[in-house]
Each structure stands twice: as structure tokens, then as C-alpha cells.
Amino acid sequence: MKHIINPNSRYFSEYKPNHLVISKLNIGSHLNCLLSMLKKNRTATKLSYLSAVLAFISVNPANAALSTTTVNSIKGDKPVFFATESIVNKLGFNYNGTDYNEISGNITSNTTKYFDHTTNLNDFVIKSYFVPRTTIDDNKGDYFDINNDAFDPKQPISNTLNYVWKDSNNVKIDPADFNNIACSHNKYKMPLKLEITATDIKVHTQFGDPNESDPVNFIETQSMGAQPITKTYQIAIANTCFAKPYSLISDPLTQWRSVKNDKSENDEKWNLTGIGINNIPKNKPNFAVGGGVTEDYVFNQGFKVTPTLSKKHFPTTGFAGAQFQLVMGGVQNDYTFTTNNSSVTVDKDGLITLNQPTKTVTITATLKSDDKIHYDYTFSLDLWLEPKLQSFQNQNDARAQCTGSSKLLSRKELNNSSEFSTKNLDGAKGRIYNVFTRGIGYGVFSEWGRSLNQQYNSLIVTYPKSNWKFGWYYTNESHNTTNDNNEAISEAILVSSHDGMISFPSAWGIDEAKRAVCGTYL
């Protein structure tokens, strides 16, 4: 015999021979039913009537006295997590006590979110922000229990969150760079991407059976079918990073030069890094011949805004048409650039142009999306130069071009990179090979690099708004030597605008132009 009470209900009972399952909620109705059956049997004695009642009472779910009775747990519906397309917007992170996710509106996937220069990627705590539905049709929520079971107060929902930091070219960020990522332009293309993926999403109730939902690992999209539950945000760290001379922007292949190990001539190729003279790498300063860069210069980026060696910021020298870019963390176009000095201009990309002699200049970069984040870069010029366009046959004619407080400069003011910048060159003849070292305060050509206002043979223009031409520039110094007839002469000392080489007119003949550059201390 089978007796079923409301089989569609969460609680129901079945009555079978030797197998009795009874609902906690329907004990009273079963008891009345059994008593009615017994009363119909008029031959039953009081004892048998009482025995039957006692036998029924012993079938309480809390009582296991009957060996033929099995009590099963009460079954209901599983809680449900709704894997809609919008749930990816509830993946986010907490940083410095603030929660960020697209559903809250303080970050979106299609724009770059900036944080200030103190940001450490290790401090981002990846989180999900799923909430329960108040009703089954509440689209603002993400999970529901149709039987109204209470959710587990300690862990109503669980999931596995994986994340990865990448740059704009999908290069994975090395965790070693997490604490200083803003100015890692040589390693990563900005902005960064934070990719968050949720798997094994489950809902948990406190008492229900079952008390856990099926795991969710995908969402069904209308256009692409099943897709992983992944959200990607664009992140950038605001900061001032580099002061980048325009010569580096226009011609990155000629950042520094070196001298061949046998000193027979300068290396034809620039930017070399192998072992050089005196076992010093060719990209490091070498006082014997110059060349390489100081610790204040970063390959392909220019000078650090916070120098390691120098106590001053780049530049300390200037000329009309000198240009450099203030390189920022993130994307240049995300900032507004202004200056406090009318003698210089700065464009929308942070490209600064020096127009007139001036002493101290401050450039301010303000984040467009948050004007509370802004940075000042201040530099002070010590020396202002005026290169002359024409060439001159001798040092005296060149000197005559400098009037007032201006004058021809010393070799160390143009290139102070090697022993040839200051040593006595009396008796020297021919070509002595040496070049500039890129460093702040190492002279005009050491700061600004190869200087040229128009193309010369295959050489690319580096400062188009300046008056620098290819050639040799007279200094205010000379040395005693002899000519081809072994006659004693006094000869001017020159410096090349191409690579800062210090030399003499007789070493290069009359075919290469000799020019004048006048300087004034500010």
C-alpha cells in the first residue's frame, strides 16, 4: 500500500509495507487516519487499540525503535546563481579601503583608471561583489533560494578568483615590478590591464538540503555563446617619469657614441654596450675617451626626473629651439600641461620648447580625469647658448660674433666627458678620438645629444627649431703645436656638434665648417 500526501510539496510522506517515511509536518493527520481505521474494527479490544496507538507514536522521526522504519532527510531545491552577462561587472578590487567595480560606477572597462605615484600593485585586493536577489525576478541581485532558506551568514557565496596584470601588448607584468611600475616604459606599454576571472561560483544556505548550488564557470552570451566569467580593467599610475630630449625622439639610434678599443677612430655604430677601453662597457662613462651614459640617463627614455647622481634637473643648459618631452606615467594625452614661464611653451603632449633666455621654469602636468592628481617639474638654466648659422675661417672671427655678456665657451662647457675636456693639449696633433657622455651638467652636447637643425647627408634632424648646424664649433681655448712644416703655431680647439668630439682645425682640413656658438650665464 502506498500513501502519498502532496508529492509536489517540499515535505511529503510515503507509507509502504515495512518501510515508513513520515513528514514532521503531517504527524497529526497520520495519527487521525490510523485511529479512524482501528475504530472501524469493532472486535478490537482496548489493549489492541492502545497498542496500535503506541506503535504509531513510536514511529516518530526522532525515534529509531522500529528496525523496519527508515527516516530520510527532507529534500528541497538547490539555491541558484544566475549567470547573466552582467555579472562580470561585479568583479573588481579593493585598493586603500575603496571598492572598485563597474557596477558601482567608479571604474569602467573602456577607460583608463589612474592611481597616484605611491601605488603598489601588490596592494590591490581582488574581489567579487555578488549580492542576493530580494525576489526571483530581481535583476539587481545574483543568487536566490526558492525555498527561502537563509543564506550561510559566514559564506553565502564562494568562488575562485584568478587575476593577471598585463601591459597593453599583453606582456605579463613581472611581480618584481609591482611596487614601481609607473615609469617602466622600457619594459611595458601603458596603460596596464588587470584581468580578473571567476570560476566555481557556488551559493550556500544555512540549513537547506541541498544547501549548495551547482558550480558556475561560464556565462551564456547572445553573440558568442558560453564565455568565461572575465573582466578586464585598464589601470595606469600617474607620475612624472623622464625628461626626454627631442634628439632621442627624432633619432633614437644615436643616443651615445663610443671609441674603438684600439682608439683608431670612433665606433661607427652608436648605442653600443660591449666591453670598451680599459674594460669599461661602451654604454658606461669612460673618462679616458668619454662615451656612454651616466646613471641619470635611461636608454630610450632620457633623463630621470629624480636624478641619481646630479643635484640638478635636466636641462641646465638651453638654446632657442631646444625641446624635450616631460614623459608621464600612463598615456601623455591623459594629462594637461601648463607652464609658469612665458619664455617657454608646452604642447598637449608635454613637449617643452625653450624660446628665450630664462632662469627657472616649472611645468605642471594635471590628470584630466582627476585634477587633484598633478605633478610639477622644475628646472633651472645656468647657461644660454646662441649658435651662429655662418662659418668662420678663424677663432678671432668667431669670437667677434659674441657681444655683450656672451662669449665663446670652453670645451668643458660644450663637452665635459673625458680627460680631453680639461687636460693640456699642447703638442697634440692630428685626430684624437673622444665623444660626449650623456649626463646632466656634462656640457651642452652631453645634455642635448647630437644637435642638428636640418638634414646633413644621412643624418636626421634632431632640433628643427634651433640654429645648430653640422660642423665644428670654436671654443675660447687654443693649444700650442707645430704645423706640417714643423713651425710653432697656436691653434684653436674645436668641439663637434655631432658627437661632442674635441679636436683641432688642422685635423679636419678646410672642408668641414667651423662655426661660432656664444654663451651667457644666467
Task: Annotate each predicted stretch with a short phrase.
Residues 59-68:
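Sec/Tat signal peptide C-region and signal peptidase I cleavage site
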Residues 66, 256-257, 261, 268-288, ...:
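Short, structured beta-strand segments at or near domain termini in extracellular proteins/domains
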Residues 72-160, 168:
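Long, solvent-exposed N-terminal ectodomains/accessory regions
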Residues 147-346, 351-354:
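Extended, non-transmembrane interaction/recognition domains
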Residues 305-338, 345-414:
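Extracellular adhesion/carbohydrate-recognition regions
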Residues 385-477:
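Conserved hydrophobic ligand-interaction patch in extracellular adhesion modules
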